[in-house]
Amino acid sequence: MHTDTTRENPQASAPQAADSSQDLAATAPGQLRVIKRNGTVVPYTDDKITVAITKAFLAVEGGTAAASSRIHDTVRRLTEQVTATFKRRMPSGGTIHIEEIQDQVELALMRAGEQKVARDYVIYREARAAERKNAGAASDVAQPHPSIRITRADGSLSPLDMGRLNTIISEACEGLAEVDGALIERETLKNLYDGVAEKDVNTALVMTARTLVEREPNYSYVTARLLMDTLRAEALGFLGVAESAPHHEMAELYAKALPAYIEKGAEFELVDAKLKEFDLEKLGKAIDHERDQQFTYLGLQTLYDRYFIHKDGIRFELPQIFFMRVAMGLAIEEKDREARAIEFYNLLSSFDYMSSPPTLFNAGTLRPQLSSCYLTTVPDDLSGIYGAIHDNAMLSKFAGGLGNDWTPVRALGSYIKGTNGKSQGVVPFLKVVNDTAVAVNQGGKRKGAVCAYLETWHLDIEEFLELRKNTGDDRRRTHDMNTANWIPDLFMKRVFDDGSWTLFSPSDVPDLHDLYGKAFEERYEYYEALASYGKLKLHKVVQAKDLWRKMLSMLFETGHPWLTFKDPCNLRSPQQHVGVVHSSNLCTEITLNTNKDEIAVCNLGSINLVNHIVDGKLDTAKLEKTVKTAVRMLDNVIDINYYSVPQAQNSNFKHRPVGLGIMGFQDALYLQHIPYGSDAAIAFADQSMEAISYYAIQASCDLADERGAYQTFQGSLWSQGILPIDSEKKLIEERGAKYIEVDLSETLDWAPLRERVQKGIRNSNIMAIAPTATIANITGVSQSIEPTYQNLYVKSNLSGEFTVINPYLVRDLKARGLWDPVMVNDLKYYDGSVQQIERIPQDLKDLYATAFEVETRWIVEAASRRQKWIDQAQSLNLYIAGASGKKLDVTYRMAWFRGLKTTYYLRALAATSTEKSTINTGKLNAVSAGGNDGLQAAPAAEPKPAPVPQACSIDNPDCEACQ
């Protein structure tokens, strides 16, 4: 809010500004401050929280508890938790009302299982509140409320303009049902004090509104609009367009702001000067300012913190200008670039489709690194190994996610001819890769993220499985990077048939790396025979089931290595004629060929399924239009992209792969009133992906007509009229019907497309379903193909903490007269689950089952139906409640048996770990910290399952490499 201070607060005259050292500390920038009940502001200190918690324990356990080290440790830990909560919420400092601190103390006590102490603390607070109320009649209430003056940037004091404050709140609430502007105003004034900085008034508005989200999801839109007011004042003022602006003036101001933004951006070398060559007047008129209103708070705050272009900390890129900048960057090589820019802008700004974060970060800038994923193969020589690590650093520097194939590197104990010595194996090099990934900062946005792949026959595989363990020699551990097992079908057959399995060094069996299917089986058995005859000394024979059991055990305990399947990735690859898929990528959805001359690159984007459900059905006409434009945008990325290593450019120009995916699958089910765990959900997964596949292949054929087929088209499966659904049959034939069961049904007429694709297609690969962690937040929909994690939780990420509540659940509960404060508290008590809330009907319990309440078989089956239509793969997380070795065994066998190419994270809870957090006993704005980031499993016994990971980058809560 840009505050016009011409009107005084009518409530009272202003007191003199204080000048004590405490007051100076309380108003220092970047500090946490506490507003006391009498309106004075003091510095935030841990000591008073420690005293309050200690008194609460002493009241329950008696005075002798003061000497207990247990009490001291507990109090210290709880104090740290409370302080950490506020620092996460307000990393740049801010003001906290004393009541909010007490709310957090109460919550911390209950989460720690100290129910007796918490109950006593609640009773104490209520008693003190009653005392204040009685005393207030004679003192506090009798005194006039002091007026509030704000401190401007130049240090001058001016009265707070209550009229302006009211106008901004009213505008933020306009058109939204069941939100209370007067409540926001009252609560905001509680968090203001005399002499408050102008920017802190804006912050107080946002912080106040966001605490109300748990009561009513529409407050998320209110909060976003209040933040938008701050952003507009910041950006428009910097651009010299206006000091501030109400929403209804933005249509005119956006048209003025766009050319001013392009001019400033080019001047500061933050955007490409070529953007000045566009018809900016035409583009400015095409901007739809009403689309500013569709952001949730999480979405806009994410963009504000990490995406909008800024100079010296000042954001001067408004949301619609941000989308137009990306659109212009993607249209820069188009013939009719204005028309294409408007087409691309409309797709992005409507949230019908969203490009991946690297594209959003960098399109239209001087360094347009727009690609999400890179895959490399590491050769078996020292210069090649360190060359690959160098490539990792260069690719990661500009926000790419990496998948490295380490299978060619010889195993521990292998002979090295050049030195007449023995190899130390793969693991020491992976330690270097790990440390490089941590060291490389991706444009200041996130640390590097990498996944190392190793085939299951590699002699180092057993040590590879243990890389993420917290015990053992730390020199042979990689705590900060991901690992994945690249599993041939023959190994899975041996597991099913209870056979043995032989481990080799790739230096002795070099051709296995490039073989798959029956050819691999024949050659592998040949090498097994050589080993049995004593002609291959360096090998090891194990029972396949024992190795499988260890793979699952490590996956459960450490979260790694992920299980991915070599043969379906290769047998169904359209590009078998020019190479081999040796690994997947960081997020396990990309399956492209790699070799010493080619680093595979893939550009990602995702269709928002929610926006394509109209009147409870999939709008295929709109979907076709969206897919056509999306594929064009993805294809454009290939030519515009900045390539930091030549092998990446070589690969991308030859094959032109792209990865079109989806997000909002769970929300699309809600709109159709379909439970995730149902045959109807599987049918929707099948039919929606079939339609997207059809339209995407068709769109790529259209581009081939216009621009030509990709260079290596001849000889591909496409050139033979073999579509993804057809390659599924090849997998069945090679693997054997005994080991696979997939649905091959079709609902569309594919014959014309089979014929057409033989004439040419623009892209070697077209579809891949990425995790969409960040862009789903931006658009306000459920992530990718994920089931809902919790119906109410606090999401913590680099932008702070955000209460997330399922708006569809709230809608349905309201319709049945069940939405009230008690229901909010019940949802908190049961960690966002509805299953144990008795008054919720069974049909809603089925519809709003959360991830661990949906049987894993439904997730696998839906993924299997999608996979038959996709030429690449899916980032598929598997959720297992009551996890056991048997459940993991059944789940991952089923994933392979159903023809899946890859799996991603295992999110496992042991039998007793669905532990409730706490109930809101009063007015706490504090709910279970969860979501797809942050759940810590609490199993009954060792071994413990790995914590549910925050994201694919181990030390970063919002991986932006793959969305």
Where are these predicted regions, by residue range?
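Acidic, low-complexity intrinsically disordered tails
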Residues: 2-24, 130, 134-138, 913-963
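Core nucleic-acid recognition elements
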Residues: 2-33, 40, 67-149, 153-157, ...
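Core structural elements
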Residues: 77-82, 104-110, 196, 211, ...
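Terminal amphipathic helices with adjacent charged low-complexity linkers/tails
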Residues: 114-116, 120-125, 220-258, 487-488, ...
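Catalytic alpha/beta core of large soluble enzyme barrels
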Residues: 268-302, 590-593, 634-639, 743-747, ...
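Function-dense linear segments that define catalytic or interfacial modules
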Residues: 309, 322-341, 345-369, 375-418, ...
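Conserved catalytic alpha/beta cores of large enzymes that bind or transform nucleotide phosphates
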Residues: 419, 423-431, 438-548, 553, ...
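Internal maturation/activation junctions in enzymes
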Residues: 626-649, 653, 675-772, 842-845, ...
